[in-house]
Swiss-Prot record:
HAMAP family: Ribosomal_uS8_B
One annotated GO molecular function: structural constituent of ribosome
Single GO biological process annotation from the record: translation
GO cellular component: chloroplast; ribonucleoprotein complex; ribosome
PROSITE patterns: RIBOSOMAL_S8 (PS00053)
Segments passing through the bilayer: none
Subunit-structure text: Part of the 30S ribosomal subunit.
Keyword terms: Chloroplast, Plastid, Ribonucleoprotein, Ribosomal protein, RNA-binding, rRNA-binding
Described purpose of this protein according to its UniProt entry: One of the primary rRNA binding proteins, it binds directly to 16S rRNA central domain where it helps coordinate assembly of the platform of the 30S subunit.
Protein name: Small ribosomal subunit protein uS8c
Species for this entry: Bigelowiella natans
Length: 134
C-alpha cells in the first residue's frame, strides 16, 4: 500500500528545509488537485506537469516553492498530517477546526472533491481531514 499524499508532503517539507527552488512529485490526480489548491491559496509559486521518458513515459508535477524575497523564508511554515492510512479522521462541516484563526487552511476530501476547510464550511460539506498547512 502506498501513501502518495504522505510522500508528497514529505518531499515538499524536505525541499523547504534545504531551500530548493522546485521539487518533482509523481503525478496522481489527487496530488495535482491538492497542489492546485495550494497554488490558489498562495502557498506555492506555480505547478507544471512534466513528462520524463525512460522505458515508458512517467508524468511528474514540478512544484515551484514560494519564498519571501526579503527574508528568504518559505510561505509554508508547517504542514501537519491529520488523516493517515492507519487512522482516518472524518468530521462534519460544523466541527472543522480553524488553524491560527484563519491564517492556515485544512485540506478536506469531500464527496464534492478536494477543497479547503473554508469552502467545505461555506458549502456545508464534511469529509476527511487530510492535512493542515500554515
Amino acid at each position: 500500500m502506498t501513501d502518495n499524499l504522505g510522500k508528497m508532503l514529505n518531499k515538499i517539507k524536505n525541499a523547504i528545509l534545504v531551500k530548493h527552488e522546485a521539487v518533482l512529485i509523481p503525478y496522481t490526480l489527487n496530488n495535482f488537485l491538492i497542489l492546485r489548491i495550494l497554488e490558489q491559496e498562495g502557498f506555492l509559486d506555480s505547478i507544471n506537469i512534466v513528462c520524463k521518458k525512460k522505458k515508458r513515459e512517467y508524468k511528474y508535477i514540478k512544484v515551484y516553492l514560494k519564498y519571501n524575497e526579503q527574508t528568504s523564508k518559505s510561505f509554508i511554515r508547517n504542514i501537519c498530517r491529520l488523516s493517515k492510512p492507519s487512522l482516518r479522521v472524518y468530521t462534519n462541516s460544523k466541527k472543522i477546526p480553524r488553524i491560527l484563526n484563519g491564517l492556515g487552511i485544512i485540506i478536506v476530501s469531500t464527496s464534492k472533491g478536494v477543497m479547503t476547510s473554508k469552502d467545505a464550511y461555506s458549502n456545508n460539506i464534511g469529509g476527511e481531514l487530510l492535512f493542515s498547512i500554515w
